[in-house]
UniProtKB/Swiss-Prot annotation:
Family: Belongs to the class I-like SAM-binding methyltransferase superfamily. rRNA adenine N(6)-methyltransferase family. RsmA subfamily.
Protein name: Ribosomal RNA small subunit methyltransferase A
Alphabetical list of HAMAP family matching this protein: 16SrRNA_methyltr_A
EC number: 2.1.1.182
Organism from which the protein derives: Polaromonas naphthalenivorans (strain CJ2)
Gene3D superfamilies for the chain: Ribosomal RNA adenine dimethylase-like, domain 2, Vaccinia Virus protein VP39
Task performed by this protein: Specifically dimethylates two adjacent adenosines (A1518 and A1519) in the loop of a conserved hairpin near the 3'-end of 16S rRNA in the 30S particle. May play a critical role in biogenesis of 30S subunits.
SUPFAM superfamilies referenced in this protein's UniProt entry, alphabetically: S-adenosyl-L-methionine-dependent methyltransferases
GO molecular function per UniProt: 16S rRNA (adenine(1518)-N(6)/adenine(1519)-N(6))-dimethyltransferase activity; RNA binding
Binding, S-adenosyl-L-methionine: 12, 14, 39, 60, 81, 118
Amino acid sequence: MKHIARKRFGQHFLTDRLIIEGIVEAIAPLPGQPMVEIGPGLAAMTRPLVERLGHLTVIELDRDLARQLRSNPQLTVIESDVLRVDFLQLAEQVQSAGALRGAASQTPSPCKLRVVGNLPYNISTPILFHLLDAVEVIEDQHFMLQKEVIDRMVAMPSTSDYGRLSVMLQWRYAMENVLYVPPQSFDPPPRVDSAIVRMVPHAEPARLDVKLLSELVRVAFSQRRKLLRHTLGQWLEQHAFSGEFDVKRRAEEVPVAEYLALAQQVQTGTAQPEKIELL
């Protein structure tokens, strides 16, 4: 019986064989690597991935699809909302299971988790933020997303796409758009263009309180057209910031590095030797 895509799950199933091959080549899975696929759906990517890996863990919310996936002994199926999955715990479980299968000897040690998937477009941003909590145990991520979301992720300052998502993700990842995927590659076709993004965690990111940085950036971009003195300036005063930061700019004009430096100063209560003036 054919599975009908469910709108409430944001389901669009990948069917283009050439695109699937291109995605798998971009991921370049190796035997024994610990990998998790989010939203395997009808297993279009799952099958070629598991052929190369030997075993694959998948997270699927749709009960009917999860039941079908369990028929493959090479898959470990987690039937759950991905936003409820603890990826720190999952990484440990996947790595331990791989060691029991004798896979650990085929991959570098320690083996970090590789995460892939065709993310539901209606909750893709929450998933990306959810994974920030587990970035220390992740080797890389390859996701199918709306192209416009990827444009925002990799955007540079002083562009219309540059925003909170750009700052938060560029803090932790080096990212690139590796493959364009047209709507006709799916069934049913989405009304948007899609693409594959590669996300590789930075080896030594700035050590920051993620909640503080997220709040700082959210406030900064809350009114994009206004100067920062009307938004972030007030927030800095509320946090008794004694350093200097130029708030006669709009949020989109401030580079990622400056946001990170400012968050570091607010977090530690110190100012850099070269002052950034709060004007």
